[in-house]
From Swiss-Prot:
This is YTH domain-containing protein 1. It is found in: Nucleus. Residues 432-443, 651-670 have a biased composition (Gly residues). Residues 451-471 have a biased composition (Basic residues). Keywords: Differentiation, mRNA processing, mRNA splicing, Nucleus, Sexual differentiation. It comes from Drosophila melanogaster. The gene is Ythdc1. Residues 254-391 form the YTH domain. Residues 29-38 have a biased composition (Acidic residues).
Length: 721
């Protein structure tokens, strides 16, 4: 590119920024949008590009006119822009003159052009400010500035007049460049002489398919605009602005992956040789993404470095027919363990500190900061784009060839009818799905073994499907299944559980039991334990046998394990109500309201203890088919001896001392000495008469005594009666 163009770079950059301020304000935007439609550029980015191009009047440099000439013309254009609006036709004529002028400029930028270009650019930057406002005016009144520009007597300016199309100041700037470009031949010649930016122009022109014609319909000749956009890319002054436009184009239909390396030497090797290799499972994911997306960008980071090392585009799927580079590998990994060689096009080899990315959180990795992720972690596209925009521009890398590849890929995808579908990776976290070697966590594959064996599928809507017990139990109506918690997604949610269902973070206690009967019982106990002290006394809750399970719909029968007939409960005597006994009971005194202890305060009892208290009030010999849990092993509460002792205590009526012994322990320890509980329960119960043989109520008294405290406090069941 001519030296003048380089000199102009600074002022042009300023102008480009000014133009950017006004981006997308005018009607031209719509025109641009139409032009760019085929282009696959974002209208906004295109407009910005064209603006950028305009701002660097040197866009002509794109058209291979020396940037100086174009900048001169551009500056004169800007100055004369309002008049320059003349008519698109003059622009066309000027195009031919432009092309010749451009060629001339290319051949021999006169010192005047060089210096003048510089000066003009500066003035342009000054004028541009006004131009931006003027531009809008121009858009409205496309006065024939072209004539004025022509008076400037520079053919490049004449080209600019073709910009008459420019409606907005920035757009007019762009269109100036475009006007210069408008003659496609000019563009081509420009592209030959001009930097790779011209390549961009070609792309756009090709995309436009004779953008000139198309451009003309737009208030500015869109094609010129595109050209100018491309030209803007060429002109260094526009370059800073154009870089973002190019990135925006590159981020279309793109997937982003985090690549973590244990060794900075490997990343340096990759930057030098433009290849990478990763583990086979990541290899497969990247290859799949390469088939489905227009671009696959890899964002590199070295572990413990505190920064990103740059980002690159996959140029091809991994190949095993290429020899591996001499990577620096830990002794535990053989080079043969790696996948194929992935060819890369580096877009930025510069580093970016993690501190600059703290505001970005990857929603595809449970909302963790984007810097956190394992090797091969996919980044949500919007966040990936934001992250890549934070990298400084790498001036040593020419983006145009990469953009051409991207455009070609897009064309192939269009022909094949492939549409990029953005969906989070199957394994939302490393604990997720057993697949892909990504550590199927606690609940990977065993579907039939019982609680928490759900195979996790993350394709559906919210991240947890309604909890459905695998034994045909309709347990909690709509929800309650929780993923194992991550600190970033703490409340898996007992959202759909019955009112007041357990809201604790751990897996619900009823999920721990293998049989549905045990699970149902545990569910009830959990419900009681959690709601104790938070609800007014509830109506009588019969023993588990008659209890309709919440959400079961059909009552108890609906919740029974598949093999158990509902009739098995008919053999049990109806529960004894305390008011069936002699005399009217005194009003129970309710426990003072208490703050529920923090979740996890009272860990669920062991399976044996749970079974023991559960069966305490049932007949000594359970009906056929009823699950037998603890036998008399746990203190004999459900054995004949335990029941006899309890009944004797209740009937004797005098065991006040015993009454305190069990309850006095309070807290979780209270129910652990089950013998004391059973014995003492009768002592407390004498007031009510021998209502359920002592055992029945001891069954209920256990879970609540743990919260209760002193022996004087009645059990939950006593309170409610």
């Amino acid at each position: 590119m001519p030296r003048a163009a380089r000199k102009q770079t600074l002022p042009m950059r300023e102008m480009a920024d000014l133009d950017a301020v006004h981006l997308g304000l005018d009607e031209n935007e719509a025109d641009i949008a139409e032009e760019l439609q085929d282009f696959e550029f974002n209208t906004r980015s295109e407009a910005s590009e064209s603006n950028g191009g305009d701002s660097s009047d040197s866009e002509p440099s794109i058209s291979s006119v020396s940037t100086a000439t174009s900048s001169l013309a551009g500056s004169s254009k800007r100055k004369t822009k309002k008049p320059a609006k003349q008519s698109p036709q003059p622009a066309v004529e000027t195009k031919s003159s432009k092309s010749s002028a451009k060629n001339k400029a290319k051949r021999e930028p006169t010192p005047e052009e060089l210096n003048g270009g510089k000066k003009k650019k500066r003035t342009d930057s000054g004028t541009k400010k006004t131009t931006s406002s003027e531009a809008s005016d121009k858009v409205k009144s496309k006065s024939p500035d072209t004539e004025d520009r022509q008076p400037s007597a520079k053919k490049s300016r004449t080209k600019i007049p073709s910009n008459a199309n420019d409606s907005a100041g920035h757009k007019s700037d762009l269109s100036e460049a475009e006007d210069e470009k408008p003659s496609l031949p000019t563009l081509e010649s420009d592209s030959e002489s001009s930097d790779s930016d011209s390549g961009t122009q070609h792309k756009r022109n090709g995309g436009n398919g004779g953008g000139n014609g198309r451009g003309k319909p737009s208030s500015k000749s869109s094609t010129p605009e595109k050209d100018s956009v491309g030209g803007g890319t060429h002109s260094h002054s526009q370059k800073g602005y154009d870089y973002m436009t190019k990135l925006n184009y590159l981020f279309r239909d793109t997937r982003f992956f985090l690549i973590k390396s244990n060794n900075s030497d490997n990343v340096q090797l990759s930057k030098n040789k433009s290849v990478w290799a990763t583990l086979p499972q990541n290899d497969a994911n990247l290859n799949q993404a390469f088939k489905e997306a227009r671009n696959v960008l890899l964002i590199f980071s070295v572990n413990e470095s505190g920064k990103f090392a740059g980002f690159a585009r996959m140029a091809a799927p991994s190949r095993r027919d290429i020899p591996q580079v001499a990577w620096v590998l830990p002794p535990s990994i053989s080079p043969k363990a790696l996948g194929g060689v992935i060819e890369l096009d580096w877009i930025c080899r510069k580093e970016l500190s993690f501190n600059a990315t703290l505001h970005l959180h990857n929603t595809w990795n449970e909302g963790k900061p984007v810097k956190i992720g394992r090797d091969g972690q996919e980044i949500e596209p919007k966040i990936g784009g934001e992250l890549c925009r934070l990298f400084p521009e790498d001036e040593q890398i020419e983006l145009t060839p990469i953009l051409k590849k991207s455009k070609e890929t897009a064309r192939v995808m269009r022909e094949k009818g492939i549409h990029v579908i953005y969906k989070p990776p199957r394994s939302l976290s490393s604990r997720g799905h057993g697949g892909g070697g990504r550590g199927g966590g606690r609940g990977s594959n065993h579907d039939h073994l019982g609680p928490m064996r759900h195979k996790r599928s993350y394709h559906g809507a919210p991240h947890h499907r309604p909890y459905r017990h695998h034994h045909g139990m309709g347990l909690p109506p709509g929800g309650g299944f929780k993923r194992s918690g991550s600190p970033y997604r703490q409340m898996g949610g007992a959202a759909g559980a019955p009112p007041g269902g357990p809201g604790d973070m751990a897996m619900p206690s009823w999920e721990r039991y293998m049989s549905s009967a045990a699970a149902a019982e545990a569910y009830v106990a959990d419900y009681m334990r959690n709601m104790h002290g938070q609800l007014p006394p509830l109506p009588f809750v019969p023993p588990f046998a008659q209890l309709p399970i919440p959400g079961a719909g059909a009552g108890a029968a609906g919740a029974l394990p598949p093999g158990a007939a509902a009739a098995m409960y008919e053999q049990l005597p109806p529960p004894v109500r305390y008011y069936d006994g002699p005399g009217a009971p005194p009003l129970p005194d309710y426990p003072p309201p208490q703050r529920p202890p923090p979740p996890g305060f009272d860990k669920a009892p062991s399976y044996e203890e749970f079974a023991a208290w559960k069966n305490a009030g049932l007949p000594t010999v359970p009906p056929p088919g009823f699950p037998v849990y603890g036998g008399a092993a746990n203190g004999g509460s459900n054995g004949a001896g335990g029941l006899a002792a309890a009944q004797a205590a209740a009937a004797g009526g005098g065991m006040g001392a015993g009454g305190g012994s069990g309850g006095g322990m309070g807290g979780p320890g209270g129910y652990r000495n089950r013998d004391g509980n059973n014995g003492s329960a009768g002592g407390r119960r004498r007031e009510y008469g021998n209502r359920s043989g002592g055992g029945g109520s001891s069954r209920d008294s256990r879970p609540f005594r743990e919260r209760g405290g002193g022996g004087g406090q009645r059990s939950y069941r006593d309170n409610r009666r």
